[in-house]
């Protein structure tokens, strides 16, 4: 019974499926009861076949695609296509609705086309039906081969990788439709390099050998070919892959030599490169972890070997100073290894490599060596000793030359000490610890040859001399005290509390004792036994008229050995006070007036400067008076100052010619004969006067006397203006007798004056001759 029910249900489902398409194909229809009328309006629909076309279709164009058909039956019906490709790629027969393709189609360029179908009236061009959109799909054919995304690939993989290590993922693309079976599937195949690599899966390259050694072959080139499932391949279906092997630390260092020999001087600096130990390690620098060590010999603390991965070498450096006199040769065995290497990469290779190193030390003339790095001596102050301490330096070389000692005078402290040829230090003056408690000396040791001459090799050492204290300073006040007391102070009034210090080294148990040097009538000193003392009023009530300041000599003693006692004076000022005991009037003790040496020196220099200035003024005035006494005025003397670039002849420049001759010629006089030089020296040129009894002279006696009188008056006229005084004339010009006094406005020139006689006066007057003489070249210009 249950089986029958299940069969009936299945039959009902099947009938429902059969009736569903009918309903779907007529969406405009509605089921109505049989009682309703059967007359209703039916909608017109487009009718055409499914539009599909193969790409790259063979045959002559055009190619039939399909038919569009409308349910409208009208004799004037016309079909049209609209769209981007309508009229170019696709056309429709306006009468039948057949659609044709007029070009070969490529699905990889355009997989489908969207068009719009129209049905219009031929006469009116009006739409008889609503436009309908439809699609023409291009069917794919297997007309494309796989193409790599790039022609060259670069990849890397560590050397000595295990088989199956991924290297790179290649990608090739087939432009065909992937939904069509086997059209877009890609098959990869190695064309070159299959002995070291392989392809697994879709383009994954893996290692196929475990012996990929970068030091043997650093790079591999493989060629990969692609094709689709149907075996279609082309020129673009291959790609080249360059695979670089990455270096790993898989090689041990090996010495390039089994024996290394070096020769170095004994004065090589500690830490300086001594030599290089080259090793062979084909790994790259970042994987060279060479470790050098000394395996045989007792010199592990004498030398060190620092690796240099870049140059693939180990650098030997001394850790201690070398001494030829002690060891002339070092011989030891070294080992090179790499502790970071992966032992899985080794194949029977030794993990260690050894070599022999021999270092020969050569002798160098070294400076003297002091036995100690520094010296410390002690000396009591106020003591002069012929020997404080000794320094000792020796020649480390085999020659064992003698040594000379000296103290560098780097400061004034060095003048207190001396050193003899044996290195014994002594003081030449007594020392005061309170001035300098320490003396730091620099002692030089110089190597001397057989004649006692320094060879240039020297060394220095620091010597520290400590001055020990002696009780040679008496105690004194700790500070200056300004004690004051009221004139009506009562008995027992505390005036001031005093304390003491000692410039000597003060021990913890130092004790100072205080006492008055003389008994005072009105002050009392009380020792507190704690290195302080109180000064109090003894009777009270002071008289300011009798004494405004009281001077108390106080004795202060220490407990040193020997005990010293010092005297310090305390000055107590008596002041007027108010009722509250406040000081209202005090006369402080004036400081002693004195003049220091510096002030005296300054005063003396000022007095000396004033005296020198006064003397210079006096000498200048005296020289001016002497010049006037010679009978020459200042303007005449000034006229004889001739400036030129040639060397002068001293007094001969003033005695060899007469300035008055030049003046007479400049004022239009005739050319005079050259005067004879006077044999005796003269300060001024002698004026060549005409003889007293020359023919044509009028009244020679009277005229000569008058000229002499006028000349003396002019020479001794102290009230006359100086020669460089500016003369101001009230009127000047054409209406004046003198007209213009300026040389710029005159029409006359000195061209008619003959100065050729200057050429006869010698080379000293060459400059004047060139300035005033005629130039023969000027005559050629006219």
Curated annotation (Swiss-Prot):
Pfam families found in the cross-reference section: CADH_Y-type_LIR (PF01049), Cadherin (PF00028)
Region entry Required for interaction with PALS1, spans: 620-659
Positions of glycan attachment: 58, 154, 360, 440, 522, 534
Side of membrane Extracellular, spans: 45-598
Membrane topology: Single-pass type I membrane protein
Domain Cadherin: 45-148, 149-255, 256-370, 371-475, 476-592
Coiled coil (residue ranges): none
Positions that bind Ca(2+) 2: 55, 108, 140-141, 143, 176
Extent of the signal sequence: 1-22
Subcellular location per the Swiss-Prot or TrEMBL entry: Cell junction, Adherens junction; Cell membrane; Cytoplasm
Propeptide feature ranges: 23-44
Single GO molecular function: protein phosphatase binding
Keyword Signal set for record: yes
Keywords of the record: Calcium, Cell adhesion, Cell junction, Cell membrane, Cleavage on pair of basic residues, Cytoplasm, Glycoprotein, Membrane, Metal-binding, Phosphoprotein, Repeat, Signal, Transmembrane, Transmembrane helix
Entry note about domains: Three calcium ions are usually bound at the interface of each cadherin domain and rigidify the connections, imparting a strong curvature to the full-length ectodomain.
Subunit structure: Part of a complex composed of AMOTL2, MAGI1 and CDH5, within the complex AMOTL2 acts as a scaffold protein for the interaction of MAGI1 with CDH5. The complex is required for coupling actin fibers to cell junctions in endothelial cells. Within the complex AMOTL2 (via its N-terminus) interacts with CDH5. Interacts (via cadherin 5 domain) with PTPRB. Interacts with TRPC4. Interacts with KRIT1. Interacts with PARD3. Interacts with RTN4 (isoform B).
Full protein name: Cadherin-5
Organism this protein belongs to: Sus scrofa
């Amino acid at each position: 019974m249950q089986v029958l029910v299940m069969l009936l249900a299945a039959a009902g489902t099947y009938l429902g499926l059969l009736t569903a398409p009918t309903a779907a194909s007529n969406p405009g229809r509605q089921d109505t009861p049989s009682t309703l009328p059967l007359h209703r309006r039916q909608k017109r629909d487009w009718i055409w076949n499914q539009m599909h076309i193969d790409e790259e279709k063979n045959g002559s164009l055009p190619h039939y695609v399909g038919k569009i058909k409308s349910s409208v039956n009208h004799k004037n019906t016309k079909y049209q296509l609209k769209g981007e490709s309508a009229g170019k790629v696709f056309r429709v027969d306006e009468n039948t609705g057949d659609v044709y393709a007029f070009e070969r189609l490529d699905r990889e360029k355009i997989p489908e086309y969207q068009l719009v179908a129209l049905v219009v009236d031929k006469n009116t061009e009006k739409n008889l039906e609503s436009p309908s959109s439809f699609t023409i799909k291009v069917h794919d054919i297997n007309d494309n081969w796989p193409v790599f995304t790039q022609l060259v690939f670069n990849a890397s993989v560590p050397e000595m990788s295990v088989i199956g290590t991924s290297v790179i993922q290649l990608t090739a693309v087939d432009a065909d439709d992937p939904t069509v079976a086997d059209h877009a599937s890609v098959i990869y195949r190695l064309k070159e390099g299959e002995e070291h690599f392989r392809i697994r899966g879709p383009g994954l390259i893996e290692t196929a050998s475990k012996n990929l050694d970068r030091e043997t072959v650093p790079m591999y080139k493989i060629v990969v070919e692609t094709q689709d499932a149907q075996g279609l391949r082309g020129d673009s279906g291959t790609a080249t892959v360059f695979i670089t092997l990455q270096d790993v630390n898989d090689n041990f260092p090996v010495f390039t030599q089994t024996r290394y020999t070096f020769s170095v001087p004994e004065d090589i600096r500690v830490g300086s490169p001594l030599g290089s130990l080259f090793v062979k390690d084909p790994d790259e620098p970042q994987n060279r972890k060479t470790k050098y060590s000394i395996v045989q010999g007792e010199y592990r603390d004498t030398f060190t070997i620092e690796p240099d991965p870049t140059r693939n070498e180990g650098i030997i450096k001394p850790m201690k100073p070398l001494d030829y006199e002690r060891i002339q040769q070092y011989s030891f065995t070294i080992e090179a290894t790499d502790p970071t290497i992966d032992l899985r990469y080794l194949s029977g290779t030794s993990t260690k490599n050894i070599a022999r190193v021999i270092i020969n030390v050569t002798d160098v003339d070294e400076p003297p060596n002091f036995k100690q790095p520094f010296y410390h001596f002690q000396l009591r102050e106020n003591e002069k000793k012929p020997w404080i301490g000794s320094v000792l330096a020796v020649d480390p070389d085999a020659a064992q030359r003698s040594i000379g000692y000296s103290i560098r005078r780097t400061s004034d402290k060095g003048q207190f000490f001396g050193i003899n040829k044996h290195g014994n230090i002594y003081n030449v003056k007594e020392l005061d610890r309170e001035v300098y408690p320490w003396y730091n000396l620099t002692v030089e040791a110089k190597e001397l040859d057989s004649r006692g001459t320094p060879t240039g090799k020297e060394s220095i050492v620091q010597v520290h001399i400590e001055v020990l204290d002696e009780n040679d300073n008496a105690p004194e006040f700790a500070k200056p005290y300004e004690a004051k007391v009221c004139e009506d102070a009562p008995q027992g009034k505390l005036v001031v509390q005093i304390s003491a210090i000692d410039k000597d080294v003060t021990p913890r148990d130092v004790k100072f004792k205080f006492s008055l040097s003389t008994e005072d009538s009105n002050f009392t000193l009380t020792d507190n036994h704690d290195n302080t003392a109180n000064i109090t009023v003894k009777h009270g009530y002071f008289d300011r008229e009798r004494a405004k300041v009281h001077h108390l000599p106080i004795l202060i003693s220490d407990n040193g050995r020997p005990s010293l006692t010092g005297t310090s004076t305390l000055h107590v000022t008596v002041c007027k006070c108010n009722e509250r005991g406040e000081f209202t009037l005090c006369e402080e003790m004036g400081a002693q007036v004195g003049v220091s040496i510096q002030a005296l020196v300054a005063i003396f220099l000022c007095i000396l400067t004033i005296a020198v200035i006064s003397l210079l003024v006096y000498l200048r005035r005296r020289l001016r008076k002497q010049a006037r006494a010679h009978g020459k005025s200042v303007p005449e003397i000034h006229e004889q100052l001739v400036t030129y670039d040639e060397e002068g002849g001293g007094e001969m420049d003033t005695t060899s010619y007469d300035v008055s001759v030049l003046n007479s010629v400049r004022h239009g006089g005739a050319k005079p004969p050259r005067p004879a030089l006077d044999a005796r020296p003269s300060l001024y040129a002698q004026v060549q006067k005409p003889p007293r009894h020359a023919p044509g002279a009028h009244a020679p006696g009277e005229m000569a006397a008058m000229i002499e009188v006028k000349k003396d008056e002019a020479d001794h006229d102290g009230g006359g203006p100086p020669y460089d005084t500016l003369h101001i004339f009230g009127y000047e010009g054409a209406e004046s007798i003198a007209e213009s006094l300026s040389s710029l406005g005159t029409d006359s020139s000195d061209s008619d004056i003959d100065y050729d006689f200057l050429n006869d006066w010698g080379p000293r007057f060459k400059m004047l001759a060139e300035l005033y003489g005629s130039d023969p070249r000027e005559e050629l210009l006219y």
